[in-house]
């Protein structure tokens, strides 16, 4: 599957909007989000993906076609097609796994008879972005920096005959034969195997299959003579299953001849593959990373058919029809990971990660070196792991997986399983679309979070149903509490060592959803519990169960995972859970959750009484409430499922989430009408299934921002996972949007894909800047911060919200410019300081530092000349 993306800036009153629409172009059909019909659109220009070992050797290039794939071999085209109606049955959000589904398919092959076996097949007009494939656990079949091309050219298919394969916006596939002067055109002969029937109608070839009819339009042939295009009368000749060309009026053999058929998949016009939105993050350069569920039908790595003609695949909810694992992933899928430039104009890479069964990404984070870390779940025994992985073997049903990719996404730096013999990392009652126990919002089964410390050690908060889940010696809870426990663990930077791991839970269902690092490597964890005996500590806010079906919890763990420093229930007599926890720069603890009770409003001037979302701030010891408040519509029930959370440097609190009243999410309705809005809201109305963004000022004094985001009828949502705000308060939000094949979700002009080019859901990336986090500065040096004396450096002060700038270059010189040019005339290492100032901002100023190294490139000979023979003959010996 191929994901195409683009973003653009739109400057509003207090925020910038970047929107990216992620379009998969292959197969699928009915909407994952509600069965609505899309607006008319042109066909996405086809691209051809090279084979660098990720597929079987005979495939040279692959292209996604409507409801299938086209495989290009040296001497053949292989068409692999599925029935659109069958695919639509499995790609629907309301479909519970109520049994296996039969998916009808058809494969046929066009062979160029007696063609040159040594033909040179190459791609032309390559993409700037690339794809990485980590499919299965055999590194021989991993491929990095796989390019796409607009054209595949067969040089010397026959003697004097070349073949060009390409596409345009009107037709999904075109191929031209280019016949050189004096070459024999009658060499061209194609044999079509596997079709139910072949027939000529009005000089067009109809290839009848069990899932529809493919039409190759009347061939168009021409020559360029004296600079003018001269059409040549050309016809198909069909003899059994052999296809050739005839020229009733002949042609001038002294000039090249081009034969140009058009292939029209008239039966396969509407259906494309699902790419559901799960998780997003950022790096220090503002690049955006998104992860999602990529519908892997046909199964990854196994789409090469062994027989031609009609076939059936039994779809049971897992790749290859594996429906017996009881997992909570209804449809076959791999992880799809993409990186985009900070302005959204470039797709940097897309990476596929998975094995022969199901995978989903739940949380992403970028480490201090710019490498991407993925936390997710895999049901594949052959999920890709690294050579020195902590655990290279799947342990039971679904396991937690942690995978680290290089900054270019082209190689694995580490990858491991973590789990026991039952399900790990999935918070669910069986059934993808069933509410129950702690799974109260659609997508709650895919919660959990990954984060890092300054040494790039990896921390994960999740859950497990495995009594034999691996725990470390001396863990704070070494035994399984029962049914489902929360769990947390720490890996080293390359995933080769499990530094610590522990259960946390009681006798009922428990789950960890979020974590943040405290002082000196301690860990704060938050989640939900149904256990009245969940471990708590004396002196914490609430050491006993608060009531209702479930409570939230906050826990503080020591640096080696051996001691519960503080732990507290959080909730009311109703139903409560905490979905995110964050610390401010003073170490105070903040959390956001849902409630059906009357969560107390304390020391908070701003609140929306009787609302279903609460924000709590406590001291680091979890013993004192600093403030607590509620926000929402005042309906008495939760309105949104939280997806991202932040406390910025000014102690403003940011919340992102989505709600739905749609029948597409039966049992998960969160009425999001009448949410608090501000005058500068991006959108002030909702169709009932949209995203919502909320910013609360320091000490809960007031609402700073409230807005909906979405299109009318677009059914925006996420299918689980975390998105993130960066430290400046910029949201990087993954969405599942355009469901039903529509383009109703707003995008901005010039984006990579301004419309949804599928007839299904696609992952949409939103980057929204609120400009509320006070002054923030960074330093960039161009062309570089090291060099030889004299060294001239162009400094770029990347500043948010500053009005005054002060530079100290470390050599006694200063500047008040925002982007000064400075020359160093002496060698040495200089510490450059930039201070950005705005007296009216919440934090007044911010400071950044950068080291500049200036060297001397002159050479001094460290030897003496040796006098040989006489004074007229100095030689260096």
State the predicted function of each range.
Residues 781-787, 864-871:
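Short beta-strand segments of immunoglobulin-like
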Residues 790-799, 873-877:
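A short beta-strand segment in extracellular, disulfide-stabilized domains
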Residues 105-116, 170, 253-788, 801-806, ...:
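A sequence-level/structural motif corresponding to short, flexible coil/turn segments enriched
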Residues 804-823:
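Surface-exposed, flexible coil segments in extracellular/virion-facing regions
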Residues 1-36, 834, 842, 858, ...:
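Bacterial Sec-dependent N-terminal signal peptides
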Residues 181, 789, 826-827, 871:
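Surface-exposed loops/turns
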Residues 11-14, 30-272, 279-282:
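Residues that cap or anchor secondary-structure elements
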């Amino acid at each position: 599957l191929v994901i195409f993306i683009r973003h653009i800036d739109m400057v509003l009153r207090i925020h910038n909007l970047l929107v990216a629409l992620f379009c998969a172009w292959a197969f699928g059909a009915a909407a994952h989000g509600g069965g609505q019909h899309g607006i008319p659109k042109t066909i996405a220009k086809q691209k051809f993906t090279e084979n660098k070992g990720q597929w079987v050797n005979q495939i040279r290039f692959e292209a996604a076609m409507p409801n299938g794939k086209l495989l290009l071999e040296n001497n053949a085209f292989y068409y692999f097609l599925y029935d659109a109606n069958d695919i639509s049955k499995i790609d629907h959000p309301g479909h519970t796994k109520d049994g296996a589904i039969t998916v009808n398919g058809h494969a046929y092959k066009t062979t160029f008879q007696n063609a040159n076996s040594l033909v040179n097949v190459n791609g032309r007009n390559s993409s700037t972005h690339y794809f990485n494939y980590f499919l299965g656990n055999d590194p021989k079949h991993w491929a990095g920096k796989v390019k796409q091309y607009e054209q595949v050219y067969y040089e010397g298919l026959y003697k004097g005959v070349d073949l060009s394969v390409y596409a345009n916006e009107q037709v999904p596939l075109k191929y031209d034969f280019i016949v050189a002067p004096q070459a024999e055109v009658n060499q061209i002969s194609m044999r079509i195997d596997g079709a139910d029937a072949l027939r000529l109608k009005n000089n067009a070839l109809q290839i009848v299959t069990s899932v529809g009819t493919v039409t190759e339009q009347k061939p168009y042939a021409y020559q360029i003579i004296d600079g003018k295009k001269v059409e040549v009368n050309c016809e198909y000749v069909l003899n059994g299953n052999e296809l050739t060309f005839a020229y009733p009026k002949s042609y001038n053999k002294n000039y090249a001849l081009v034969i140009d058929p058009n292939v029209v998949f008239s039966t396969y016009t509407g259906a494309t593959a699902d790419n559901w939105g799960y998780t997003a993050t950022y790096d220090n350069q503002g690049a955006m990373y998104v992860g999602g569920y990529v519908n892997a039908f046909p199964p990854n790595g196994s789409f090469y058919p062994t027989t031609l003609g009609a076939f059936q695949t039994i779809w049971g909810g897992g790749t290859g029809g594996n429906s017996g694992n009881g997992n909570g992933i209804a449809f076959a899928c791999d992880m799809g990971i993409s990186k985009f430039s900070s302005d959204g104009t470039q797709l940097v890479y897309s990476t596929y990660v998975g094995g022969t069964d199901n995978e989903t990404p739940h949380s992403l984070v970028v480490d201090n070196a710019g490498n991407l870390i993925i936390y997710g779940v895999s049901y594949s025994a052959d999920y890709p792991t690294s050579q020195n992985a902590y655990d290279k073997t799947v342990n039971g049903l679904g396991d937690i997986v942690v995978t680290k990719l290089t900054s270019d996404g082209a190689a694995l730096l580490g990858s491991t399983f973590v789990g026991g013999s039952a399900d790990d990392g999935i918070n669910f009652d069986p059934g993808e679309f069933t509410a129950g126990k702690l799974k109260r919002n659609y997508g709650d089964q895919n919660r959990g979070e990954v984060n890092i410390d300054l040494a790039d050690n990896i921390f994960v908060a999740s859950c497990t149903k495995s009594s034999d889940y691996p725990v470390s010696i001396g863990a704070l809870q070494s035994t399984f509490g029962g049914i489902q426990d929360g769990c947390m663990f720490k890996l080293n930077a390359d995933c080769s060592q499990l530094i610590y791991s522990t259960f946390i839970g009681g006798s009922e269902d428990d789950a960890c959803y979020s974590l943040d690092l405290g002082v000196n490597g301690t860990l704060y964890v938050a989640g939900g519990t149904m256990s009245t005996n969940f471990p708590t500590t004396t002196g914490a806010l609430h050491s006993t169960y608060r009531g209702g079906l479930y409570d939230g919890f906050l826990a503080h763990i020591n640096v080696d995972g051996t001691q519960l420093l503080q732990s507290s229930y959080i909730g009311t007599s109703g139903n409560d859970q905490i979905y995110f926890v964050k610390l401010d720069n003073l170490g105070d603890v903040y959390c956001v959750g849902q409630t059906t009770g009357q969560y107390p409003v304390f020391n908070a001037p701003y609140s929306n009484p009787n609302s279903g979302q609460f924000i709590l701030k406590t001291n680091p010891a979890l013993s004192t409430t600093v403030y607590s408040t509620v926000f929402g519509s005042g309906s008495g029930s939760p309105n949104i499922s939280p997806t991202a959370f932040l406390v910025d440097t000014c102690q403003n609190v940011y919340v992102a989430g989505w709600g739905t009243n749609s029948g597409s999410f039966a049992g998960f309705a969160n009425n999001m009408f009448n949410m608090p809005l501000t005058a500068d809201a991006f959108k002030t109305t909702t169709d009932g299934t949209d995203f919502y963004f909320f910013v609360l000022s320091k000490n809960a004094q007031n609402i700073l921002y409230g807005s909906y985001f979405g299109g009318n009828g677009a059914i925006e949502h996420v299918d689980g996972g975390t998105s993130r705000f960066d430290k400046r308060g910029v949201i990087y939000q993954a969405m599942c949007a355009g469901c039903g094949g529509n383009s109703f979700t707003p995008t901005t002009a010039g984006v990579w894909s301004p419309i949804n080019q599928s007839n299904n859901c696609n992952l949409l990336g939103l980057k929204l800047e609120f400009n509320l986090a006070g002054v923030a500065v960074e330093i960039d040096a161009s062309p570089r911060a090291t060099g030889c004396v004299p060294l001239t450096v162009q400094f770029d002060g990347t500043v948010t919200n500053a009005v005054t700038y002060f530079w100290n270059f470390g050599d006694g010189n200063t500047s008040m410019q925002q982007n000064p040019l400075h020359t160093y005339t002496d060698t040495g290492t200089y510490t450059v300081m930039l201070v950005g100032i705005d007296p009216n901002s919440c934090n007044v100023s911010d400071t950044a530092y950068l080291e500049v190294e200036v060297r001397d490139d002159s050479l001094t000979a460290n030897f003496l000349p040796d006098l040989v023979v006489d004074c007229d003959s100095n030689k260096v010996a």
